[in-house]
């Protein structure tokens, strides 16, 4: 973050040549617009609501982040619809290796629990994952070694905050049911 607290500056040698000012880029799953571009450095304006709702306010110099360009129309979709509209940040309860894979358990904030479903989709720091366990106050996903090596999941630990985006389809279903419910 810059000293103004409303801009995020990142050095992105692989991504920077492929984006321009005005393009959307997901940073830890949060959709941001490139507002400045100089060489390998990208600048993003960050709203206060975004800082309040995400883990971006906790970033420090050299913090690893997940970066991803917006999906182009016609490009293959390899996961679920991730929009970059973070619902909340949630605390990592545990991150443990089991055999060759990794189990990540994350706190499930009560305000969002109705969006979580066993075998449903969720994005954590922008990574499309499947809810493998739905517990009373948390959920767990399994991480394969490739995902761990190629994302910032490799750097998280119990107590860290991750960005969580629940499946948009659950939100649309909720909205449709609310509109079709009889009104008193």
Give the location of each predicted region.
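Conserved loop->alpha-helix
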Residues: 1-184
